[in-house]
Amino acid sequence: MAHIEKQAGELQEKLIAVNRVSKTVKGGRIFSFTALTVVGDGNGRVGFGYGKAREVPAAIQKAMEKARRNMINVALNHGTLQHPVKGVHTGSRVFMQPASEGTGIIAGGAMRAVLEVAGVHNVLAKAYGSTNPINVVRATIDGLENMNSPEMVAAKRGKSVEEILG
């Protein structure tokens, strides 16, 4: 698994995986490459992209462009999550829970890259089921998308934040 990290303006870019794939035709095989990348501002914005091309650099470039276009906002709580969350995509299930200051990112592979660029500094996370990087990234982003801040919950219920936090 290749890891490249670049700063593009204020965005952090991480390459999670590059894979050679082939298409079989009458004359033999046609090889191409796929790249999976994540992009984030380190402050709650994160996106992922999947690109495919005949050459590795072109696949990475396509993936980075898609990642920049598909960014979501995540409401973080002082560098950690608001509450424990689960994310699911096909056969991958992820569980993430907030951790105290100084814990660091305790997560594996593709999940770690997503959490780093999103700006999460303290989290405990575990991937269950399929560890296919694409599915793990999608499940992680699904979990982060489904996380609600106390302000969001209070607005939905028509109550004050103090009532929600009890």
Swiss-Prot record:
Record's function text: With S4 and S12 plays an important role in translational accuracy.
Gene3D superfamilies in alphabetical order: 3.30.160.20, 3.30.230.10
Domain comment in the entry: The N-terminal domain interacts with the head of the 30S subunit; the C-terminal domain interacts with the body and contacts protein S4. The interaction surface between S4 and S5 is involved in control of translational fidelity.
Organism of derivation: Enterobacter sp. (strain 638)
A cellular component annotation (GO) from this entry: small ribosomal subunit
A Pfam family matched in the record: Ribosomal_S5_C
Keyword Ribosomal protein: yes
GO BP terms: translation
Quaternary data: Part of the 30S ribosomal subunit. Contacts proteins S4 and S8.
Keywords from the named record: Ribonucleoprotein, Ribosomal protein, RNA-binding, rRNA-binding
Protein name according to UniProt: Small ribosomal subunit protein uS5
Sequence similarity: Belongs to the universal ribosomal protein uS5 family.
Domain S5 DRBM: residue ranges: 11-74
GO molecular function terms attached to this record: rRNA binding; structural constituent of ribosome
Gene responsible for this protein: rpsE
Entries under PROSITE patterns matching the protein: RIBOSOMAL_S5, S5_DSRBD
InterPro entries registered for this protein in UniProt: Ribosomal_Su5_D2-typ_SF, Ribosomal_uS5, Ribosomal_uS5_bac-type, Ribosomal_uS5_C, Ribosomal_uS5_N, Ribosomal_uS5_N_CS, Ribsml_uS5_D2-typ_fold_subgr
